[in-house]
Amino acid sequence: MDLSLSTRTVGDRTVVEVGGEIDVYTAPKLREQLVELVNDGSFHLVVDMEGVDFLDSTGLGVLVGGLKRVRAHEGSLRLVCNQERILKIFRITGLTKVFPIHTSVEEAVAATD
């Protein structure tokens, strides 16, 4: 399966809608998108993972890398996810303590840092 990405601006946040599989083959596409956004001055990102069907360790690494990039600019990276199979990966790896995870884009956009 492939990876789909789209971006939109909501207030001062950039929302990245992700769909499909984030794995060793598709993660570089997500990494490029996050790097490009940060390089263009978007330091407050919301990654909407509601359309993600699969996530592996490569995908987790890309998200952690994105978080480091935005934090270097006093920014934030928030996730939106309600899917138990994806949330389980974040719990098992302890990344629920690293990433703020929200139930909706609206909630993530409204959250303050």
UniProtKB/Swiss-Prot annotation:
GO function terms (MF aspect): anti-sigma factor antagonist activity; identical protein binding
Entry keywords, A to Z: Phosphoprotein
One Pfam assignment: STAS
The record's account of how the chain is modified after translation: Phosphorylated by RsbW on a serine residue.
Family matches, as InterPro entries: Anti-sigma_ant, STAS_dom, STAS_dom_sf
Domain STAS: start-end pairs: 3-112
Positions of modified residues (Phosphoserine): S57
Function: Positive regulator of sigma-B activity. Non-phosphorylated RsbV binds to RsbW, preventing its association with sigma-B. When phosphorylated, releases RsbW, which is then free to complex with and inactivate sigma-B.
Protein family according to the UniProt entry: Belongs to the anti-sigma-factor antagonist family.
Protein name per its UniProtKB record: Anti-sigma-B factor antagonist
Species name: Streptomyces coelicolor (strain ATCC BAA-471 / A3(2) / M145)
